[in-house]
Amino acid sequence: MNSPFHNIGIVTRPNTPDIQDTAHTLITFLKQHGFTVYLDEVGIKEGCIYTQDTVGCHIVNKTELGQYCDLVAVLGGDGTFLSVAREIALRAVPIIGINQGHLGFLTQIPREYMTDKLLPVLEGKYLAEERILIEAALIREGKTAERAIALNDAVLSRGGAGQMIEFEVFVNREFVYTQRSDGLIVSTPTGSTAYSLAAGGPIMQAGLHAFTLVPICPQSMTNRPIAIPDTSEIEILVTQGGDARVHFDGQTHIDVQNLDRITIRRYRNPLRILHPTDYQYFKTLRQKLHWGEQLV
């Protein structure tokens, strides 16, 4: 096959029904068309891939996929997709999702049509979409204590004590407000259909260059979501945090102390997501959010 891709990485979601059969179909398909296949070692350890399917494949750590592959295919749900996206963002390697989960905003190709949808993509017939990511730093006593990136959102939230937290928000060093609430969601357009949407935030079209600041149960009802350009730098000063944390895509977190500062900006590399040529963003929203359907 005359393809712009040569080395294809595969990441699988553990504890997923029929994942071995789906992986078998994909690996066999790629080998038959002459691609070099790289497998995430965790998927093998978790029994997601038949032993015989590993023959002739390279087995690597998920963090190495961006180093060796020019395309990564995710077999799973949006959670698996998010975890892989953060790992490969450094290398700017494109990613494509095959849905083995439930909602599937990011992993959109149905597994039953997987090879039919992938063949044109591997031949170079696809739609490419760039999504911005968040880069966050935790500043403690004037020094950077932690760094993290996220595709969906960075969420400052109260901890297990259940008490409201208090913090100040700045955008480009300009004071915005002091807020008492259960927390604050800083969302990308990709994350606008996730936690942000559940908290009352707006849906932003995926290619929009913006962030939203979405309060979580604010004490003041006048605290509403705010949209800002993605060229902005956001700073959050935690004044009364208790056992607050900052969560990234709901998968990793950093513990926060009083007077910690969290700075958030756009990550230097966008994530490049590939879609079949019949992909339509608003069609996806209609299907996933059940717009225009008779519900009763």
UniProtKB/Swiss-Prot annotation:
Keyword flag Metal-binding: no
Subcellular locations according to the entry: Cytoplasm
Cofactor field: a divalent metal cation
A molecular function (GO) term: NAD binding
Reaction(s) the record says it catalyses: NAD(+) + ATP = ADP + NADP(+) + H(+)
UniProt-annotated binding residues for NAD(+): 78-79, 152-153, 180, 182, 251
EC id: 2.7.1.23
SUPFAM superfamilies per UniProt: NAD kinase/diacylglycerol kinase-like
One Gene Ontology term from the biological process aspect of the record: NAD metabolic process
Keyword Ribonucleoprotein: no
Active site: 78
Cellular compartments per GO CC: cytoplasm
Pfam families to which the protein is assigned, alphabetical: NAD_kinase, NAD_kinase_C
Enzymatic class: transferase
Assigned keywords, A-Z: ATP-binding, Cytoplasm, Kinase, NAD, NADP, Nucleotide-binding, Transferase
Role of this protein: Involved in the regulation of the intracellular balance of NAD and NADP, and is a key enzyme in the biosynthesis of NADP. Catalyzes specifically the phosphorylation on 2'-hydroxyl of the adenosine moiety of NAD to yield NADP.
Similarity-based family: Belongs to the NAD kinase family.
UniProt protein name: NAD kinase
Lineage of source species: Bacteria, Pseudomonadati, Pseudomonadota, Betaproteobacteria, Neisseriales
Gene that this sequence comes from: nadK
